[in-house]
């Protein structure tokens, strides 16, 4: 769990790579249902066949399933994961069979808590996970990231952009502006636009400032 752009998915992908396991990215949304996760019947060659869902395939192959933004889905849809994540380690496929999980199978869920469109996870599901709270990036690590992504960027500007992001973070913490503009991806995109010749002001507007749609808030961000 953690704010946006704190590296939740990167951590999950690197864990899968470190263990040498295939990874399935499963993006959750409000219309997600059990069939989207486990699989569903479909017609193929004039016959009804079972089309495997990503959780089913991950369980069979012993992969790492990354349940991205798990708190976007309805709790009813997530109930199918209960048997997968507890001592049973199995998937019940209605009308077919009970599928045991391969021993290597792991599931990692990511979520931004309290964001628009998200909902509370029920306690039954939450109790099946251990929770890592992802910290916000420090000044030192932010400068390392900028140097790694933009090796041609002058050290002075690396520091300036790092401080810009941290200043926005302070404004968000003090509720002067919303979290919409606190977007590390947006800052990196703005720097890429500058590299392609877009003026700095316009690039920062597109990458950061315009993420807040209120004109008064935009003026606060520009300050």
Identify the meaning behind each predicted range.
Residues 1-166, 173:
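AAA+ P-loop NTPase catalytic core and its hallmark functional loops
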């Amino acid at each position: 769990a953690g704010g946006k752009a704190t590296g939740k998915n990167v951590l999950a992908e690197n864990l899968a790579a470190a263990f040498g396991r295939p990874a399935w990215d499963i993006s959750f949304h409000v219309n997600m249902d059990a069939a989207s996760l486990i699989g569903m019947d479909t017609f193929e060659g004039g016959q009804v066949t079972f089309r495997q869902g990503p959780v089913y395939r991950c369980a069979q192959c012993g992969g790492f399933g990354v349940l991205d933004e798990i708190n976007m889905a309805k709790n009813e849809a997530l109930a199918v994961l209960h048997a997968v994540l507890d001592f049973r380690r199995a998937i019940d496929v209605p009308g077919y069979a009970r599928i045991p999980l391969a021993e290597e199978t792991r599931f990692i869920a990511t979520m931004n808590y309290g964001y628009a469109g998200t909902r509370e996870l029920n306690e039954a599901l939450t109790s099946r996970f251990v929770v890592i709270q992802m910290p916000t990036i420090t000044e030192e690590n932010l400068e390392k990231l900028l140097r790694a992504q933009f090796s041609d960027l002058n050290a002075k500007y690396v520091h300036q952009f790092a401080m810009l992001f941290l200043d926005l973070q302070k404004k968000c913490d003090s509720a002067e502006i919303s979290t919409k503009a606190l977007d590390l991806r947006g800052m990196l995109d703005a720097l890429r636009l500058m590299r392609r010749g877009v003026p700095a002001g316009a690039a920062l507007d597109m990458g950061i400032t315009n993420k807040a749609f209120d004109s008064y808030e935009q003026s606060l961000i520009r300050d």
